[in-house]
Amino acid sequence: MGQLCWLPLLAPLLLLRPPGVQSAGPIRAFVVPHSHMDVGWVYTVQESMRAYAANVYTSVVEELARGQQRRFIAVEQEFFRLWWDGVASDQQKYQVRQLLEEGRLEFVIGGQVMHDEAVTHLDDQILQLTEGHGFLYETFGIRPQFSWHVDPFGASATTPTLFALAGFNAHLGSRIDYDLKAAMQEARGLQFVWRGSPSLSERQEIFTHIMDQYSYCTPSHIPFSNRSGFYWNGVAVFPKPPQDGVYPNMSEPVTPANINLYAEALVANVKQRAAWFRTPHVLWPWGCDKQFFNASVQFANMDPLLDHINSHAAELGVSVQYATLGDYFRALHALNVTWRVRDHHDFLPYSTEPFQAWTGFYTSRSSLKGLARRASALLYAGESMFTRYLWPAPRGHLDPTWALQQLQQLRWAVSEVQHHDAITGTESPKVRDMYATHLASGMLGMRKLMASIVLDELQPQAPMAASSDAGPAGHFASVYNPLAWTVTTIVTLTVGFPGVRVTDEAGHPVPSQIQNSTETPSAYDLLILTTIPGLSYRHYNIRPTAGAQEGTQEPAATVASTLQFGRRLRRRTSHAGRYLVPVANDCYIVLLDQDTNLMHSIWERQSNRTVRVTQEFLEYHVNGDVKQGPISDNYLFTPGKAAVPAWEAVEMEIVAGQLVTEIRQYFYRNMTAQNYTYAIRSRLTHVPQGHDGELLCHRIEQEYQAGPLELNREAVLRTSTNLNSQQVIYSDNNGYQMQRRPYVSYVNNSIARNYYPMVQSAFMEDGKSRLVLLSERAHGISSQGNGQVEVMLHRRLWNNFDWDLGYNLTLNDTSVVHPVLWLLLGSWSLTTALRQRSALALQHRPVVLFGDLAGTAPKLPGPQQQEAVTLPPNLHLQILSIPGWRYSSNHTEHSQNLRKGHRGEAQADLRRVLLRLYHLYEVGEDPVLSQPVTVNLEAVLQALGSVVAVEERSLTGTWDLSMLHRWSWRTGPGRHRGDTTSPSRPPGGPIITVHPKEIRTFFIHFQQQ
């Protein structure tokens, strides 16, 4: 029965089983030396630098210089940059340049980290690649051309598009589901051309090599020794290298007495691998985690071993050579084999055994996941805010060098946390704290930069409060919209007075509402309705009113009233649904069951349909004792049985206002509990006439509270409906494209193996309606029943598995988390039109800068003083920034400068603006919004000045797109979807056309003022 789980996936592989080895002669093994260097995981970056990472580059550079035949690939940039900037001597830097020029040292991927593929957002993947590529190009003039994604826990269908756009010629991955990998090995299907996007099809395809069952490490066991094989430098020691140079588990040295045994072991492994691939070219990775910190002993043993094998190649049937990844792919490409095509499906979820589904990390350390995304959103806003400040001309006295330092600090922190043992929540507590500290420090610097920009814009109009016992006369709020569309939304502030008057730049009253704070009993939540053009500000004065609202002529924020409902026990009752309480706006009526205090149903106005919707919290009880069975940990989700309700009673209150109505539900573990463990705060907005509130009206905003959990509990929010979903949900790959997720019954562990990552959105549907969930952080998501969708919110685990205990990876997370989901309910056409923009409205909510005022109300700059940046609704401004790179955009000129010893300009280039545009829709998804969109960049960017030049670049900016010619790989009759030819590209110019799902990157140059 186990094989039935993967038989549907195996069938097309067997049908397409290719012919055997393409040429006679010995197998050719490409030995690729590498070190897998986690940017975090168990040890902090600084601990790793001290214990082994710095020594990797120091010793590898030294040893490569000693042997012309030797090779090495470097992957992540964070450790290399720290070594380059803080450790490397001038001589070592010279040697690195020589080795790169000779092709004996090769950078692959070239990003700051090796990012996770399941729970990262595409924007952040691009950022970390751009950070690494910019450094490599500026410093060496090189551009990575191959990926080495060997350790992320599953593979996303976004990956081929990402790496193709970055200019890569081939992609290498490893971790896919164990039974699928076994089937692909048997069918010799581990190499294929991957077309990740159904809309882009072959336009952004990439040749893909999936590593075999040995993955990125050499065989750890050899038959003639009880030590590991081929790891002559042993295992890295923390906190610092041993003084005697003796490390644990050092492989036996190669000697005349055992060289035949070593050769037989290596050759046997090469032949075993060769049987799983179609050509006689075999990739043999030499290395593993934390290897090559003593490259001298490594090469001193491998050199004679390879020489010995080559001297007996005829009888052994194998020849071997040191190689970079590029050497291997070039040899493979030269064979001109016809490869099968894989379509836009991903390789998620990932399992290593029947009871080892790596689906727990989709939710692990939810607080860190949320912090990482908030930091990313703040960086996104800060980039465009600084760009608008500098162009068309700086309007204040801000030091651009200091500003770039603040931006760079947060770029680095956001890039770092995309590592596959960072945002995944699979790191030790001290490493989690390192990531959080770096993010918090970067966010603090960014907020200082934003505040400086706003003050420069406003001075001297806005007097700030001086220190006084009397306290501030009121508050001042600047609200910035980082999206390139006009946004109407609610911003929430906390104030210390119950009566408030809010006015805008012209002194006009602004729709607002005051209510008791949900977090601070002595304070109040002030809700302000704001409409902000793209990349623009609104400024508000907030002052206490003279008295209560009644009896005064002064327009003030309306006061919300609270209706409370007593605590209700959880029970099945025939009386449910007798007394329904409606909460309505112009788009929805949410009906609440007064007998249960739970949501009962939602009526959607446009389709005039009522859908039964009930939400509750459940917990999976999981095992923590390896003697009792499979366990859950940071990585794995292994429930023993179905989830059970996590509450016995629920209270409800409705806070009703003219602007917003809030439904608050508090879930208690028992009837007499003093504190609730779970909560849902749902918000519907009543958009006043005269405001375009389509997105605002068509969403139910929900914030949850979960925790602290009891030990070995995994908490989910289950939403049950009467939609006939056939137990199919759709969830996104990295916020870029959706994947269909039908429920699959497995012999073992079906609950966990039907969990999928939701990075930004998910939905389920029937023939009439669709329920959409939008998220501001990653979660695990599943449908465990027809019409059901459950989102894992939080995990708290401990187990006695020695490996987990040794590395402190038990996830005893006692925190309280506050994730947010927005719900959209409606017809397919309505939700299709709104889903993408609503998801971005959640991810990139307006940034509020809040301060105290003194004296009379200041004169504020009006909206008419700002020119908006506005794009069509199907086109997203993915980035607008000033990277500050010092290199010339002309590759020939930059290369000449490097050869002359000029490492770029002395000052950062503030004139080059990076622009990236992204078409949000798939081909055929919407009759209007899926059409190609043409824009004139001169008109779109006129608020920043006069555009004098537009250069189209590769995704990370390092290639002039007209000079980028990626390899073409021969394919058979592939399953083509979407356009089959590349759209025409006019040579330069400001008028561009962006096709469905395209991402296009430009350097924009403006007229100097």
UniProtKB/Swiss-Prot annotation:
Region annotated Disordered, chain positions: 972-991
Keyword Thylakoid applies: no
Chain sites annotated for binding Zn(2+): 36, 38, 151, 420
GO MF annotation terms: alpha-mannosidase activity; carbohydrate binding; metal ion binding
Top EC class for this record: hydrolase
Record's catalysed reaction(s): Hydrolysis of terminal, non-reducing alpha-D-mannose residues in alpha-D-mannosides
Entry keyword Glycoprotein: yes
Subcellular location: Secreted
GO cellular component: extracellular exosome; lysosomal lumen; lysosome
Keywords on record: Glycoprotein, Glycosidase, Hydrolase, Metal-binding, Secreted, Signal, Zinc
Annotated PANTHER family: ALPHA-MANNOSIDASE (PTHR11607), EPIDIDYMIS-SPECIFIC ALPHA-MANNOSIDASE (PTHR11607:SF28)
Protein name as it appears in the record: Epididymis-specific alpha-mannosidase
Species: Homo sapiens
Name of the gene: MAN2B2
